[in-house]
Design a protein with these regions (language model features):
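Rossmann-fold NAD(P) dinucleotide-binding segment
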Residues: 140-141, 152-170
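N-terminal Rossmann-fold NAD(P) dinucleotide-binding loop
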Residues: 85-86
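Short, well-ordered coil/turn residues at beta-beta hairpins
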Residues: 146-149
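NAD(P)-binding Rossmann-fold cofactor-contacting core
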Residues: 95-123
Length: 170
């Protein structure tokens, strides 16, 4: 990809992903970025792209919330309390300053508790953090709902919600 403007660089991001990495103490996705001189192709930088990719991915739902969420949104639900959940919540908090309740739904108690502690420290303006036991509890009465989950290749593991759970205007 060519970056014009003041950057005048070419670059690419390499994405490697394996759901079994977690068992090895590694992140599911391992990303690298290479930047090159636009004229010569000479490498200028090779670096980890995990952080920049996480914020780019989390920023996308933030852009959606900026333009589509109700301005008086108070309740946000994150289903999937991992890295993408964190960057998505960061984006939501930036564009929806009235958020005061966070609902969390996850598969493992460790990731839920880590996310809860992080959210409390990072966003003291949150008045309430609720850990939900199922998707219905997480979705009902939420103004913003974000699924940041990893699923296996089996469609039966895909998260599911019902229309009647969705708050009017959410």
């Amino acid at each position: 990809a060519y970056l014009g403007g003041s950057h005048q660089l070419a670059g690419m991001k390499w994405y490697g992903s394996n759901i079994e990495n977690k068992e090895k103490g590694l992140p599911r996705s391992i990303l690298m970025m290479m930047l090159n001189d636009k004229d010569t192709g000479a490498p200028i930088a090779m670096m980890s792209a995990n952080l920049i990719s996480s914020y780019r991915t989390g920023g996308i739902p933030g852009v959606g919330a900026r333009y589509l969420a109700r301005k008086d949104s108070k309740v946000v639900s994150i289903i999937g309390p991992g890295v993408m959940g964190k960057t998505s919540l960061a984006a939501f908090m930036a564009v929806c300053p009235n958020l005061e309740t966070l609902k969390i739904k996850g598969r493992g108690s460790k990731s839920i508790e880590n996310f809860k502690a992080w959210a409390k420290a990072e966003y003291p303006q949150l008045k309430e953090i609720i850990v939900c036991t199922d998707n219905e509890e997480a979705v009902r009465d939420s103004d913003i709902v974000s699924f940041t989950t990893t699923v296996l290749n089996d469609v039966s593991t895909f998260p599911e919600i019902k229309e009647e759970w969705i708050k009017k205007g959410a």
